[in-house]
């Protein structure tokens, strides 16, 4: 004799097929899975889901106990991340929501998720890439930096490196991420605290008195890594040795492995002394990018062409 499954049995079967959330945000819109996408000194990034839009997102979680000795820093961190929510640029990871979890003492923020992971791993996976492709990626990073640096107030990333740049490989799109610890500075564009990844840190950053030009230096190191497939200063086996070489003005050995003279000259411009470094806007006009168009450039060109020959009546 055949028995019919109860509705409870059907529901339990459905539950087995669905992936349960580890936690949800206070509004119930975003659910976090247990899958860890990446982690750093103070932050972990998990795969999550936006139930309203039906899209996957990234759930970033900062442990505030890392700043327990400095309550002012905690509040500043929170206010800065909230401000970043207002950034709108195709080469900057979009920030959707920010909140503080008092019970677990964490700062949480939801960002868009990129399909192909970070640029460092993506480049390792695709070792045989044309210089044209590398230039397209580099130009997009620079456009994101230009947006940050010309924002009012100016935003200095301070930790730009290839692991903080993310890729949508299906469309060749590159986005700057990990902006949660960026510095938001006033009219003088001066910042004073030390943050960053040693291999990518400009010399003046160690001196705790710097401007957005530290990002240009880091950007140059990113381009060097993309071209050479080597992390800058990998010849050093300690942070102290990196600092010693950087403070003496010694360039990373990877620079000597760059065979393309145009690429080498471009990188050297980026990692020059602070006053000699071009701005992001100036670098975008560099001959290094001649003939390199990305989607935004092509859209603009198409719009110009579409407007050609039209008569505008006022």
From Swiss-Prot:
- Give the range the annotation lists for the signal sequence: none
Top-level taxonomic group: Eukaryota
Q: Which UniProt keywords apply?
A: ATP-binding, Kinase, Nucleotide-binding, Serine/threonine-protein kinase, Transferase
Principal EC category = transferase
- Write down the EC number: 2.7.11.1
- Record GO terms (molecular function): ATP binding; protein serine kinase activity; protein serine/threonine kinase activity
Q: Which PROSITE patterns is this protein grouped with?
A: PROTEIN_KINASE_DOM
Residues of the Protein kinase domain:
31-289
Please list the residues that make up the active site.
Answer: 178 (proton acceptor)
Which reaction does this enzyme catalyse, per its entry? L-seryl-[protein] + ATP = O-phospho-L-seryl-[protein] + ADP + H(+); L-threonyl-[protein] + ATP = O-phospho-L-threonyl-[protein] + ADP + H(+)
Stretches for region Disordered: 1-22, 295-314
The UniProt entry, under InterPro entries, shows: Kinase-like_dom_sf, Prot_kinase_dom, WNK_Ser-Thr_kinase
Which residues does ATP bind? 111-114
- Stretches assigned to coiled coil: none
What this chain does, per the entry, is described as: May regulate flowering time by modulating the photoperiod pathway.
Family membership: Belongs to the protein kinase superfamily. Ser/Thr protein kinase family. WNK subfamily.
Protein name as catalogued:
Probable serine/threonine-protein kinase WNK11
Q: Which organism is it from?
A: Arabidopsis thaliana
Recite the lineage of the species. Eukaryota, Viridiplantae, Streptophyta, Embryophyta, Tracheophyta
Q: Which gene encodes it?
A: WNK11
